[in-house]
Amino acid sequence: MTDTSNSLQDLGTLTGAPSAQPVKSVEPKIDAQGRAYGTGRRKEAVARVWIKPGSGKIIINGRDQETYFARPVLRMVIAQPLIEAGRATEFDVIATVKGSGLMGQAGAVRHGISRALVAYEPGLRAVLKPFGFMTRDPRVVERKKYGKAKARRSFQFSKR
């Protein structure tokens, strides 16, 4: 610290001051058909999701959302990112999902829709992140251990 400064104007010229880096603006990632892509995962389910401007139609594995996800709670889960972003009727969603059960698949589609929305409109990341839609849920089934009946349950023990 050999440099000393007596005024605030000299503060920026000191050698220890970091230079201001320009903030990079994130460009939308849209393909030739005008679609944005996002991959979502939950448990063992993997969803590949494409969104494009449209009327709000959601198609999963070639079927309408009402036929693929018959339970209303599952349809609510996949619509959450679109509703919170205020884009429920602005985008058509096409998704292919495989693996896991219906709840895991719905979570994977939700994650994929969130990622695709951010790819299409990067400013939505600040809206979706606080709701946890951008975060991959790390909880998966615990593996079975040898010497145990299940992951944690021991075999029945008889004292006598």
UniProtKB/Swiss-Prot annotation:
UniProtKB keywords: Ribonucleoprotein, Ribosomal protein
Q: Where is this region: Disordered?
A: 1-37
For molecular function, the Gene Ontology terms on record are: RNA binding; structural constituent of ribosome
Q: Which GO terms describe its cellular component?
A: cytosolic small ribosomal subunit
InterPro entries documented for this protein: Ribosomal_Su5_D2-typ_SF, Ribosomal_uS9, Ribosomal_uS9_bac/plastid, Ribsml_uS5_D2-typ_fold_subgr
List GO BP terms, alphabetically: translation
Polar residues: bias regions: 1-18
Q: Does the keyword Secreted apply?
A: no
Q: Which Gene3D superfamilies match?
A: 3.30.230.10
Q: Which domain of life is it from?
A: Bacteria
Recorded hits in Pfam families, A to Z, give: Ribosomal_S9
As for family, the record states: Belongs to the universal ribosomal protein uS9 family.
Q: What is this protein called?
A: Small ribosomal subunit protein uS9
Organism source for this protein?
A: Hyphomonas neptunium (strain ATCC 15444)
The gene name on file is: rpsI
